[in-house]
Amino acid sequence: MINHIATRLPATILSAAVLLLSTFSCNKDEPDGGSSPTPVLTDMQVVQGASTEYLSYPAQSSYEEALRGDNLTLSTTVNVATGTSNAVARWYLIEDIGPDKEIFMEDVGAREGEADYTSSITLTEEQFTELFPSGKFKERHFYCKFAFRSSERDISSTVFTSDTMTISTGLPAELMVLRIDTVNGEEPTCDYVSPPPGNNGAGIRNCTKVPGRLKVSLAGKVLYDSGEYVADQSGMTLKIRGNTSAYSAQKPYKIKLQKKKDLLFRGDEETCKDKEWVLIKGYANLNTLIGLEAVRHLGFSWVPAMQYVNVVVNDDYRGLYCLVESYKRNQKCRVDIEERGFLIEKDAYWWNEDLYFDTSGFPSNMKFTFKYPDPEDIQTEQVLYIQAYVNKAEEEIRNGGDYGKYIDLESFARWILFHDIFATLDCAGSNLYLAKKDMTSNSKLEMLSPWDFDSIYWNGTFTQCWSNQHMYWAFYYPALLSNPNKAFLEKYKAEWNRVRGTIGDHMDRTIGEFVEKYGDAINQSRYLNAMRWGGGFADCNDNLADMRSWLRDRVGFLDSNIPSMK
């Protein structure tokens, strides 16, 4: 058996993509009334089972043109190795509701002995427009049935049915597509809340978790299907996440699977699988990719992995996102802490949490909240322990004491060095995550990977300045960098000397390779994202050029200033 897809689209295609996937299987149905000579499907590609072939097309000049090609032709061929006579092919469109719709039939004709039978269907511009309305993401599913009638017995036939042929308009084949269908089409909701006087930010609460089904595909091939929602067995839940980012029309989301899965498909399922994943809006720039790659080069104990994906919820295209591992305890693939360990955040949004604690060493309008243990599971002794431990660390920092007994100097130095390399603007709500492995003196407070990269580059305005975390007293860094105990300053200088000669080349190579491989697909997706939500977007090559220019300037600035720090 062989399958084939032939297509014809306008030569002017420049900005979005049409993706086709066809698989052909040999599902054999023999009607009642006696047997007939059974056609034997031969594998002309010498592979096991059904073969799969897909094609993707370059970008089109406008979203309108992407969905309104002059025509589209699907063609499939089946090879029959024994004598049959007439063959009739019927093409069907799978309807969302009701029986499948027959849209085309043709008499393929008679053959003698081993022969190929081919049937094609062409969608005219009018049909294409009807099936794929302009301005909307849409998937349509087709299949073809070949009915072969014996040359000797015209009362029975053998039918071969193709697997579904999926045509998805508008989404490039190089990026994964996350398709989420919620139960009864329900959308997740949240309430928007403001901070108490004297505090920062605007947040959300009462976020509903909507059950549903998740399918992940690449180039039309389904890589993962969670199945329909059954609590603790299959499916997933979807909810809105974030703080101020949740106020925009395009929402950030959190996905929670009922069964663990590595949605990034890294080839080590047992190690990398987890239930919790986040979708961060990723259309505006490459900041999340650039930030996480720089963090990885600096050598943090764990760095969230990510991929750019397109997201469709209830047949509605939601845009280009970063699918990212969430911050949580998972000793195999995320934050490696013991059951009696801690994952905490110095949090500007503490007022929107059920449990938090304060410390006395460095008064601020930020307090500590818990990522692990869950507030409903934590015991009073655990809260008192970590509060006392952080208070002691702050006391040592404030007094110029032996703070190295309480904080991990290496991770603390790498954290602020990252922000200084990129001159991060954000100071208060910049996702200050810390971990302590257990409740013993064998572990220290560790700074975890930076997370929020929206304000790196100081928005591209200033190259000759420190990060705000370096300069302002929102956290410990001004005290550590100017401390009479120079242990931290020396570690900070050592970390810069370790990476200063490699950071530029590493970022140039890794981000350059990424843009070469995925840049066109991301640019196409950014265009579709803008069509869906409005706003402008930059070209990935411009993002790459900006990063290269920035790092050249920053290495010079840091080389001129770090050695003289006292």
Model-based region annotation:
Residues 53-70:
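Short, solvent-exposed loop/linker segments at the N-terminal edge
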Residues 169-286, 290:
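Conserved NTP-binding catalytic cores of kinases and kinase-like/nucleotidyltransferase enzymes
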Residues 186-188, 202, 234, 244, ...:
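Middle-to-C-terminal accessory/interaction subdomains
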Residues 18-49, 155, 161-164, 168-171:
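Bacterial Sec-dependent N-terminal signal peptides
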Residues 256-262, 272-282, 286, 299-304, ...:
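Internal "kinase-insert"/substrate-recognition segments embedded within catalytic cores
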Residues 90-95:
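Conserved aromatic beta-strand anchor motif in extracellular beta-sandwich/beta-rich domains
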Residues 97-129:
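Surface-exposed, flexible coil segments in extracellular/virion-facing regions
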Residues 82-89:
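Solvent-exposed loop segments of extracellular immunoglobulin-like
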